[in-house]
Every structure is written in C-alpha cells, then in structure tokens.
Amino acid sequence: MLKDIFTKKKKYASVPSEQAKHDVPEGIMTKCPKCKKIMLTKELDKNLRVCMNCGHHFPMNAKQRIESLLDEDSFEEFNQGMISENPLGFPEYLEKIEKDREKTSLNEAVVTGKGTISGFPAVIAIMDSTFRMGSMGSVVGEKITLAIEKAKEEKVPFIIFTASGGARMQEGVLSLMQMAKTSSALKLFSEEQGLIISVMTHPTTGGVSASFASLGDYNFAEPGTLIGFAGRRIIEQTIGEKLPEDFQTAEFLLKHGQLDAVIHRNDMKDKLAFLLDMHQTGGEYEWLQD
C-alpha cells in the first residue's frame, strides 16, 4: 500500500570505521602496478623489489641499490655533505629541498662513492628518484663530475645508475650546464682508457638521458625502464604520427640498437662483476661466465 512506502524501514549499508581501514599498517603490503598482485613488502624487498608474479621492477632508492650490488661493508661514500643553494631565488625551492632531505635522509638526488662488486673495485654513482624526482641540478652534476675524476685518479671503472626526470627547472640554465660538464668529464676519463658503465633505471628522461646516461662504453637498462628526452605526447604532436605502444621503453631501445643489453635486476651484480673482471684481469675468474 501507499502508506507502506513511508513506514517501511530503510536499509542502511555499513561503512567501515577509520580505525578498521587502518588495521593493516601502512607499508606492510604492496600492490604491483602491472599485474595487480598484492604481496608482503618485506618479501618484495627480499626479491630486490622485483614482483614475484610478473617480474615488474619497482624503483629502488640509493641505499637499496648499494646493498643489492656492492660487497658488504665495502662502500665508502664521498662528497655527501654537498647541498643545493637557490642561485635564481626560485620561490619555495629551498623549502622543497628541505622536505626531501627529511623524507629521504639524503642531501641530494645522487649518492657517490667507491666500493667493490664481487671483489672488483669501482667508483659508483647512484641517482635516487625519491629526492626531487632525481632531477639534475648543480650539486648533482658536480657530484657526478667529482666521482668521474675520482675514478680517473684511482684508475678504476666508473659505474652510474640513472633515475631522473631530467634537469632541475628551479636552477634554470645552471642545471642545463651540468649536461656539458658531466659529458666533458666522461670524455676526459675515456681518453685515459677508463671504463664507463651506464645502467638506466625507471625513469631516465630529459637532460640526463641526453647526456651522461647515454655515454657509457656499455649502456644497459633494467626491464621496462622509460628512457627518452621529450615526452610521448609532444613527439606525437610534433611529427603528426602515432608512436608504437612500447616506444621509449628499454626493450624498444634495445631492439633499435640504442642499448647493449636489458638486464634483470637479479642478474645485475653478476653481469657487472663479469665486465669488471674482463676489463681488469682479462677474465681470470671463469666462474663469472657460468
């Protein structure tokens, strides 16, 4: 009847309380953006932050990268005290830098130092995209240049892992100058027969991809890494064509001759050790080739 419409009890849906939503502590579980599988974060970390289901490579910070590659207690960091200023007086730039320092416990977007990989010495630079998206400013360029000069001085190989959104806009032309400075340092190092190994990780874009990231004697990348200078949309608008779906991926660049290899993270240490062995001893340690 008509009156029943107004007298009938309403049905309500129960909404979880805020407390119930947070019963699982933040960071305990991680969802893979590729296959959507949910896994324990600690298990993901044990697997070098590679999805156990589909092989997707999650980003690594500098500390995780060092622990996965270098021999235990072999890493000696240098120039860690260098910090960015605000030469152009860009609004709120220093405040953003300070927030990233607190969040990451880093002073800048690259960590440099010397260590050993399976006993073979090298100077290594590792960019960290958790700090200002790994953008390249004056300090990043200077630290990388000093690391290259250190490798030249000690006559050991130079290895760099890149992860960057490109030049840091808050430093304007000073950030663009780092492209030339780092490239010049690599040129001088190469003239002294120094070995340069570049490993591009997701993402490596902008001025970083157009300078030191692409200047290795060996240019490698992790699977699925985005590598490029300009964005996909800008390129499509400029050339008036639709680009392939896998355009600007590590696999696409390998197929077109712009990379020497795409290396799974679980194999990275052994592959690097093999190259260091080959260039430093002539390949005495045959076990590395197995």
From Swiss-Prot:
Q: Which residues bind Zn(2+)?
A: C32, C35, C51, C54
GO molecular function term, any single one: carboxyl- or carbamoyltransferase activity
Q: In which pathway does it act?
A: Lipid metabolism; malonyl-CoA biosynthesis; malonyl-CoA from acetyl-CoA: step 1/1
Q: What is its EC number?
A: 2.1.3.15
Instruction: Give yes or no: UniProt keyword Nucleotide-binding.
Output: yes
Q: Which reaction does it catalyse?
A: N(6)-carboxybiotinyl-L-lysyl-[protein] + acetyl-CoA = N(6)-biotinyl-L-lysyl-[protein] + malonyl-CoA
Q: How is the cofactor bound?
A: Binds 1 zinc ion per subunit.
Indicate the segments forming the CoA carboxyltransferase N-terminal domain, all copies. 28-290
GO process terms (BP):
fatty acid biosynthetic process; malonyl-CoA biosynthetic process
Q: Which residues form a coiled coil?
A: none
Cellular component terms (Gene Ontology): acetyl-CoA carboxylase complex
The protein's location, in the record's own words, is:
Cytoplasm
According to its UniProt record, where is this protein mainly located?
Answer: cytoplasm
Q: What class of enzyme is it?
A: transferase
User: C4-type zinc finger positions in the chain?
Assistant: 32-54
Signal peptide range: none
Q: Which cofactor does it need?
A: Zn(2+)
KW Zinc-finger (keyword) present? yes
Which HAMAP family does its entry note?
Answer: AcetylCoA_CT_beta
Similarity annotation: Belongs to the AccD/PCCB family.
Role according to the record: Component of the acetyl coenzyme A carboxylase (ACC) complex. Biotin carboxylase (BC) catalyzes the carboxylation of biotin on its carrier protein (BCCP) and then the CO(2) group is transferred by the transcarboxylase to acetyl-CoA to form malonyl-CoA.
NCBIfam families reported in the protein's UniProt record: accD
Q: Tell me, how does this one assemble?
A: Acetyl-CoA carboxylase is a heterohexamer composed of biotin carboxyl carrier protein (AccB), biotin carboxylase (AccC) and two subunits each of ACCase subunit alpha (AccA) and ACCase subunit beta (AccD).
The protein depicted here goes by the name Acetyl-coenzyme A carboxylase carboxyl transferase subunit beta
State the organism of origin.
Answer: Bacillus velezensis (strain DSM 23117 / BGSC 10A6 / LMG 26770 / FZB42) (Bacillus amyloliquefaciens subsp. plantarum)
